[in-house]
């Protein structure tokens, strides 16, 4: 869901509509006209508005704002819904020791993903009308890495095995190569 929301945020050119990274205070959207005017005036200061969207009104701005807002809220929720169960199940001993380091690595990647997301947005706030494609591809790569690691761990748990993530075997060369090519093709979509 998050990758789809991120993709739609990009396709609707909504990613630069929120020009500040308010990690804790940005949880609520603007609730009155004054707050909307504040966010809209901040958007008016960036090149995307000045060069492309200078005829945009506040109602049109609200549409792109909500795409980016939902993307950020969903990211926060994913982080929270991963963090608290992880701590709880680790504390009561329900996570197999073989998987605990992978779980915490996924948590760190989720946090890093948020930081990279803001780093990506910053690239589009000055001198550009879009974000850096390199930063976008990094953001997308981390998303696919997180999803792949979670999927891999689910398969390990279902099959009661512990196989290392991205373990290379000569007899799996074609499969590994195919996965690599698909991954590269997806990342090239950022360009």
Name each model feature, range by range:
Residues 1-26, 181-191:
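N-terminal signal-anchor transmembrane alpha helix
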Residues 77, 81-108:
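Transmembrane helix-loop-helix
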Residues 128-140:
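Non-cytosolic membrane-interface motifs at loop->transmembrane helix junctions
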Residues 119-127:
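Juxtamembrane "helix-exit" motif on the non-cytosolic side of transmembrane helices
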Residues 25-47:
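Long, glycine/tryptophan/cysteine-rich extracytoplasmic
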């Amino acid at each position: 869901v998050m990758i789809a929301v991120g993709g739609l945020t990009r396709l609707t050119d909504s990613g630069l509509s929120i020009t500040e990274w308010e990690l804790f205070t940005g949880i609520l959207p603007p609730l009155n006209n004054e707050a909307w005017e504040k966010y809209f005036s901040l958007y008016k200061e960036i090149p995307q508005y000045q060069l492309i969207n200078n005829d945009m009104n506040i109602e049109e701005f609200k549409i792109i704002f909500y795409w980016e807002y939902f993307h950020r809220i969903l990211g926060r929720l994913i982080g929270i819904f991963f963090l608290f169960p992880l701590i709880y199940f680790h504390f009561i001993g329900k996570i197999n020791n073989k998987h605990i380091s992978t779980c915490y690595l996924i948590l760190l990647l989720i946090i890093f993903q948020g930081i990279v997301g803001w780093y990506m947005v910053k690239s589009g706030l000055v001198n550009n009308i879009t974000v850096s494609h390199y930063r976008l591809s990094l953001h997308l790569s981390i998303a696919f890495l997180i999803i792949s690691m979670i999927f891999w761990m689910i398969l390990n748990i279902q099959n009661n095995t512990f196989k290392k993530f991205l373990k290379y075997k000569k007899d799996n060369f074609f499969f590994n190569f195919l996965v690599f090519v698909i991954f590269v093709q997806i990342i090239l979509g950022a360009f």
